C-alpha cells in the first residue's frame, strides 16, 4: 500500500457545490458541519480525478482498476460495482487567501489547519521532521515578517493584533515546507511560493471563523431567454473558494490482489504523471473557466 500527499492550489475560483442553499446563497460551497471549514469531499474529488485520468488517455482497464468501474445508468444509484484500488480523502483547507492593506493579500491559516496537515504527513509516512504547530490566542495573529508585526493589520474584515512567533522554528518551518511541497518553485508558481514564505499568517480561531465566512467569493448570475434576451431565471448566487487557495488530501493506493507488482508499479507511475505539476479541473462551472487547480504530489510513503 502506497500513500500520496496531494496538494491542490487554485488557478481559478473553485465551486464544489453543497446540497442545500443557505439563505440568499443559492449555491454554497461544501463545508464541514462541525467547523465550517471549506472542503472538497472525497466523493466529489474522486470523480474529478477519474475524469482527469480519462482525459489524459488512460486505458479503460487502468481507469477501472484504479478508480473502479463507472456506475451503469440502469444500476442502483450511488452504488459502484467495483471500488477500485485508490482511496481518495477529503481535500481540506491548508491556507485561504485574504485581502490585506499591506502587500495586497496574504494567506490565513490556523492551528486547526496546520494540525490536520501534520496528521496527513504522519499518515503518509513522508521523510523529514514534521514542524510543531504553534499555539495562538483566539483573537490574535502571528507572522514571520516584521512588516506584518509593526502594527495591527487589516486582514479581510478583521483588525488583527500581530506579533512574532514566541518559539523558534515552528511557523517558519511550516511556511517553508508548504511553499516547497504544496506550491513549488517552478517558474509558473515561484513568485507565489516566495510570497507564501513571508505572507503566511497564523490567526486565532475567532478570526479564522470570520475569514472563512467572509473571504470566499460570490457571483450573482441570471439566465436569459435565448429569444427575447430578457431574464428568464434568477438572479442566483454562487459561492467560490478564491484563486490562490491551498488544499491538501491523502491518496492511498492499495496493492492489487496477489501482490501484482507489475500492475502496482504501473498504477503508481500513472498517478505520479497525472497529478504532479498538472492542472486539473474540479467542481462546477467548468465552461466558465472555474475549478482549475495546480496539483502537486509532496511525495509518497507507506503510511496508513
Predicted regions and their residues:
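Basic, Gly/Ser/Thr-rich N-terminal segments that form RNA-phosphate-binding interfaces in CRISPR RAMP
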Residues: 1-304
Amino acid at each position: 500500500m502506497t500513500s500520496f500527499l496531494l496538494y491542490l492550489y487554485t488557478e481559478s475560483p473553485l465551486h464544489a457545490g453543497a446540497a442545500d442553499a443557505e439563505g440568499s446563497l443559492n449555491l454554497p460551497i461544501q463545508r464541514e458541519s462541525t467547523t465550517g471549514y471549506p472542503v472538497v469531499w472525497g466523493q466529489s474529488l474522486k470523480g474529478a480525478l477519474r475524469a482527469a485520468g480519462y482525459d489524459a488517455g488512460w486505458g479503460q482497464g487502468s481507469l477501472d482498476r484504479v478508480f473502479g468501474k463507472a456506475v451503469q445508468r440502469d444500476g442502483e444509484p450511488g452504488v459502484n460495482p467495483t471500488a477500485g484500488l485508490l482511496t481518495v480523502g477529503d481535500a481540506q483547507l491548508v491556507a485561504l487567501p485574504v485581502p490585506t492593506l499591506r502587500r495586497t493579500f496574504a494567506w490565513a491559516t490556523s492551528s486547526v489547519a496546520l494540525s490536520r496537515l501534520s496528521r496527513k504527513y504522519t499518515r503518509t509516512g513522508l521523510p523529514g521532521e514534521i514542524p510543531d504547530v504553534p499555539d495562538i490566542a483566539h483573537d490574535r495573529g502571528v507572522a514571520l515578517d516584521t512588516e506584518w508585526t509593526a502594527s495591527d493589520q487589516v486582514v479581510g474584515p478583521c483588525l488583527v493584533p500581530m506579533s512574532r512567533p514566541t518559539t523558534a522554528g515552528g511557523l517558519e518551518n511550516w511556511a517553508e515546507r508548504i511553499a516547497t511541497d504544496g506550491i513549488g518553485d517552478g517558474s509558473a508558481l515561484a513568485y507565489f511560493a516566495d510570497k507564501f514564505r513571508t505572507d503566511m499568517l497564523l490567526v486565532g480561531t475567532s478570526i479564522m471563523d470570520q475569514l472563512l465566512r467572509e473571504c470566499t467569493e460570490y457571483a450573482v448570475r441570471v439566465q436569459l431567454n435565448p429569444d427575447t434576451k430578457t431574464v428568464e431565471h434568477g438572479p442566483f448566487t454562487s459561492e467560490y473558494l478564491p484563486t490562490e487557495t491551498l488544499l491538501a488530501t491523502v491518496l492511498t493506493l492499495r496493492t492489487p490482489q496477489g501482490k501484482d507488482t507489475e500492475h502496482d508499479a504501473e498504477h503508481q507511475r500513472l498517478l505520479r504523471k497525472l497529478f504532479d505539476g498538472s492542472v486539473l479541473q474540479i467542481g462546477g462551472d467548468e465552461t466558465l473557466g472555474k475549478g482549475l487547480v495546480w496539483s502537486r504530489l509532496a511525495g509518497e510513503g507507506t503510511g496508513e
